[in-house]
Each structure stands twice: as C-alpha cells, then as structure tokens.
C-alpha cells in the first residue's frame, strides 16, 4: 500500500516520475485516490504515472492532473478484464485522454507490442517477459516441445 511518505522518499532519492495506484481501492487510513493525489501535490512536484485498471480510473486520473496513464493494474483488481495484454483497454483509454498512455501488463510477443501501438499506446512497458530468465526459457522450451 502506497502512502504520501513513499512518494516523497522516492522524489528525494531522485525519482522524476512515480507510479501511483489510481484505482478506486482505498489507501492507508481510508484515504481516497483524489485525497491522496491532493496530498501528493501539496508535498511533491514529481510527475505522476497513474496505474489504472479501467477506463473510468484513467479518466479520473487525468481529471485529477496525472501526467500519464499506464494499464498496469488491468486484471489485478476486482474489475473483470480479458487476458493480458488488454489491448481493448489501451484503445479505449487512448481514444479518451490527452495524456500519454503506457501499455503495461502481459506483453511477451512482438505482435502484441505492435497491437498496443496501433491501439494508441505512447509507449509499451515489457517486464517479466524479458526480466525473468526462468519464464523466458520455459516459454522457449514449451514452443520447442510443441514443434
């Protein structure tokens, strides 16, 4: 769970951009995202990347002044989502906001990256697919064994 001190510490450590949970989940102490963001803006000048799970949370994040949106939390909250990567959500958000949309979550094939850019993504974040050598090797072995 993220709180204001986390954001301030990250900024002091040199972070210029901090990702924040921009869903409707309650923060520590029962704080809403809007209240959390107001507090962040009072205590920090860091650029905020809103990690969202839905079009609604993306629209709210933009209206509250977040500088960019990432689809990081699609499929990780109570809101139903298709299998990752959620290209449909990327397209919905990109068509409705004026800030950069970073496609994140489930990108492991070049075609899905291409699809994300075609859907309007400003950038694509690839994580586990390249940072987890065990998973990467397992995927190659699975493909080899199916050949």
Q: What does each model-identified segment do?
A:
Residues 1-6, 22-41, 55-60, 77-94, ...:
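Active-site-adjacent beta->alpha loops and helix N-cap segments on the catalytic face
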Residues 2-10, 53-65, 97-103, 107-126:
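Catalytic cores of alpha/beta
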Residues 12-17:
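Catalytic domains of carbohydrate-active enzymes, especially glycoside hydrolases
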Residues 19-20, 49, 70, 125:
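Conserved beta-strand positions in the central sheet of alpha/beta enzyme cores
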Residues 22, 52, 73-74, 105-106, ...:
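Short secondary-structure boundary segments
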Residues 45-46, 99:
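A short helix->loop->beta-strand "cap" motif at the edges of active sites that frequently abuts
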Residues 47-81:
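Histidine/lysine/aspartate-rich catalytic loop segments that bind and position anionic ligands
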């Amino acid at each position: 769970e993220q709180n204001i001190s986390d954001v301030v510490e990250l900024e002091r450590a040199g972070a210029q951009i901090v990702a924040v949970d921009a869903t409707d989940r309650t923060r520590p102490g029962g704080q809403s995202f809007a209240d959390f963001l107001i507090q962040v803006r009072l205590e920090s000048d860091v650029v905020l990347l809103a990690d969202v799970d839905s079009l609604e949370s993306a629209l709210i994040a933009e209206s509250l002044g977040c500088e960019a949106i990432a689809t990081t939390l699609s499929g990780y909250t109570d809101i139903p989502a298709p299998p990752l990567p959620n290209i449909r959500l990327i397209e919905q958000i990109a068509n409705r906001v004026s800030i950069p949309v970073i496609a994140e979550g489930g990108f492991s094939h070049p075609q899905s990256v291409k699809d994300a850019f075609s859907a309007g993504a400003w950038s694509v974040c690839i994580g586990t697919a390249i940072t987890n050598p065990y998973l990467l090797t397992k995927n190659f072995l699975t493909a080899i064994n199916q050949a």
